[in-house]
Curated annotation (Swiss-Prot):
Main location class: cytoplasm
UniProt region (Disordered), positions on chain: 1-20, 42-72
Keyword flag Repeat: yes
Segments of skewed composition (Pro residues): 56-72
First and last residues of every Sequence repeat: 21-29, 30-38, 39-47
Family to which this protein belongs: Belongs to the cornifin (SPRR) family.
Name of the protein described by the UniProt record: Small proline-rich protein 2B
InterPro entries reported for this sequence: SPRR2 (IPR029142)
Induction (record text): By UV irradiation and carcinogenic agents. During squamous differentiation of epidermal keratinocytes.
Organism: Homo sapiens
Length: 72
């Protein structure tokens, strides 16, 4: 038997098993920024008393002559 044949008869060696690369630790989940506090609703305006469209009519003052009557 030649040297070559002997080598061929050797059982094939399985390829060396590569050690599985260690997975890098998974990143910790990103920290969620704290949720914004709910926006503070501006306080509702106090209910407005019904405003009359027109200001109340003030009684017109009695007519006054522009000029006082000339005393004779």
């Amino acid at each position: 038997m030649s040297y070559q044949q002997q080598q061929c008869k050797q059982p094939c060696q399985p390829p060396p098993v590569c050690p599985t690369p260690k997975c890098p630790e998974p990143c910790p989940p990103p920290k969620c920024p704290e949720p914004c506090p709910p926006p503070k609703c501006p306080q509702p305006c106090p209910p407005q008393q019904c405003q009359q469209k027109y200001p109340p009519v003030t009684p017109s003052p009695p007519c006054q002559p522009k000029y006082p009557p000339k005393s004779k």
